[in-house]
């Protein structure tokens, strides 16, 4: 696997409005540059997090920084540092981890998960969380892929892990043993963790193909936190963030630790429940909440649920995975690339904001490979210190009955090279453009583009039109094979309750608003749009529905 690309951002002059450099044909961040520690300095993410925490909690280190909304358990800034050190010491003494070992984590959200993450980071152990709702076969495949030496689970998820195949077995996070580990004081020799060392293996969503294992280094995540710290704004009281997004997902993984490092409070929910969320917002005076798009849709469609709760503390609602874009990022970029800041940027509908600090980008023509100026659509390429270290292979090693002597994760250099070139540019696979003010617009996934008689049709554009129809609750558009056109746009539509809107009416509605080649040619009515745990539409499942024969061409 290639070494991390710690290239210096170009100093060529660029337009101060758009960030576009006519000489290099690249876009530069218009945000203040975020200071980073020297790349060669050994520094685990844990120590960087606590260095920020010391700056942001000097006035009151006894206040809570982690709260479990389910159990009401609270952890203060002082306790977080103490618990992290104690747990790291206990784990070192009991298991004698080697730097580069991988820990598999299968748990719902709780206040102890960030403690576990930080402890493992300090030991140089690679954190690899997974979705607790995955099936037993899926868990087995992920363990074969990631090659952990230990698993951390709960009494509710332990049955999914074959712990006898792991070198150090399994630790239950809701057991007296774990509680003893975080409370028992101890010391351990400091592990020299390089910033270029892997910190985490996360899985991208896999909405268009097989789930991909993404390796993020300590440097990648440090740069993401540094960018957020540079953009922070002074507050009279700490921000209180309710994280309903799973901690195994990139957003939740980064958010659960970053918010604390920036001086905030993170309130976690072990399982999502709309009324429990409302109570938590009211009880803990939540200011920021991260929600999957379907949750927001549910709140809007069932506004009565919110009655009787004081939600006046809310300042920001964040969402990702589908429309409601206020920011843009990938697992491969440690979470962030661009975001909207301030009321003026937020007024520009459809924009995902300006590039984050220490980020540069270019928009590349799909046919010629030439970098394009503002207002031209092409594939977005990004570069910066937050770009992943690489990908991992999907060998299942079916003939191996044990992982006791297996190495850590296996690099997939070929897959990495197809995503990140020799100059450090990550190909996002997203069709995008910048406007003359340096605001990024994400049009669609390139894999999802429909090729109709040589024209490229973006499903997201048609989905926006469909969802503006008063009788449509949700809609998604996929390509459907056609002998004459190659592919035609097909819509899968969920009617609103009580609606009997007809296919012909929907086709006419769309046809009046788009070019002829973009018209919906085929429609199927379904009960729900398939989505993954983080709210992203599962395109593969949609295509299966489209090809199942339930649709009729009119």
Predicted stretch roles:
Residues 69-73, 90-134, 243, 456:
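Conserved AMP-binding/adenylate-forming
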Residues 132-162, 183-184, 224-242, 273-287:
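Conserved ATP-dependent adenylate/AMP-binding module captured primarily in the ANL superfamily
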Residues 134, 151, 289, 384, ...:
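AMP-binding/adenylate-forming catalytic core of the ANL superfamily
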Residues 261, 286-291, 300-348, 357-360, ...:
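Gly/Ser/Thr-rich phosphate-binding loop
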């Amino acid at each position: 696997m290639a070494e991390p690309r710690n290239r210096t951002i170009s100093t060529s002059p660029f337009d101060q409005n758009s960030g576009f450099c006519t000489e290099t044909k690249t876009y530069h961040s218009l945000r203040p540059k975020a200071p980073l520690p020297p790349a060669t300095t050994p520094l685990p993410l844990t120590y960087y997090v606590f260095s920020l925490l010391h700056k942001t909690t000097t006035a009151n280190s006894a206040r809570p920084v982690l709260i479990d909304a389910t159990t009401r358990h609270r952890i203060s800034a002082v306790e977080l540092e103490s618990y992290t050190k104690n747990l790291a010491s206990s784990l070192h003494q009991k298991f004698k981890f080697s730097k580069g070992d991988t820990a598999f984590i299968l748990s719902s959200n709780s206040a102890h998960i960030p403690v576990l993450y930080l402890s493992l980071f300090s030991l140089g152990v690679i954190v690899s969380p997974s979705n607790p709702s995955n099936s037993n076969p899926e868990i087995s495949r992920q363990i074969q892929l990631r090659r952990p030496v230990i698993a951390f689970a709960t009494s509710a998820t332990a049955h999914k892990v074959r712990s006898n195949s792991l070198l150090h077995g399994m630790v239950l996070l809701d057991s007296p043993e774990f509680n003893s580990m975080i409370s028992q004081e101890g010391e351990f020799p400091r592990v020299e963790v390089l910033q270029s060392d892997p910190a985490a293996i996360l899985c991208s969503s896999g909405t268009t193909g097989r789930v991909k294992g993404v390796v993020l280094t300590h440097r990648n995540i440090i740069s993401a936190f540094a960018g957020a710290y540079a953009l922070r704004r002074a507050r009279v009281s700490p921000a209180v963030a309710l994280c309903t997004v799973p901690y195994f997902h990139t957003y939740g993984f980064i958010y659960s630790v970053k918010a604390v490092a920036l001086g905030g409070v993170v309130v976690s929910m072990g399982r999502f429940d709309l009324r429990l969320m409302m109570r938590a917002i009211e009880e803990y005076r939540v200011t920021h909440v991260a929600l999957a798009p379907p949750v927001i849709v549910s709140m809007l469609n069932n506004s009565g649920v919110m009655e009787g709760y004081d939600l006046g503390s809310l300042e920001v609602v964040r969402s990702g995975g589908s429309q409601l874009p206020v920011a843009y990022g990938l697992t491969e970029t440690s979470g962030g690339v661009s975001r909207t800041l301030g009321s003026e940027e937020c007024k520009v509908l459809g924009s995902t904001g300006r590039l984050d600090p220490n980020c540069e980008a270019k928009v590349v023509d799909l046919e010629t490979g030439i970098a394009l100026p503002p207002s031209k659509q092409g594939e977005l390429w990004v570069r910066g210190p937050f770009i992943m270290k690489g990908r991992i292979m999907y060998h299942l090693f079916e003939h191996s009955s044990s992982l006791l002597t297996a190495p850590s994760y296996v690099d997939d250099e070929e897959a990495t090279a197809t995503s990140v070139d020799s100059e450090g540019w990550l190909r996002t696979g997203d069709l995008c453009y910048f406007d003359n003010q340096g605001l990024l617009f994400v049009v669609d996934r390139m894999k999802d583009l429909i090729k109709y008689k040589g024209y490229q049709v973006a499903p997201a554009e048609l989905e926006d039109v469909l969802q503006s129809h008063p009788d449509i609750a949700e809609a998604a558009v996929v390509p459907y094979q056609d002998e004459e056109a190659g592919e035609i746009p097909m819509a899968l539509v969920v009617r609103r309750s009580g609606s009997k809107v007809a296919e012909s009416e929907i086709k006419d509605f769309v046809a009046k608003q788009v070019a002829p080649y973009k018209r919906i040619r085929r429609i199927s009515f379904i009960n729900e749009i398939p989505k993954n745990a983080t709210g992203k539409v599962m395109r593969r499942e949609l295509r299966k529905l489209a090809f199942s024969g339930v649709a009729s061409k009119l």
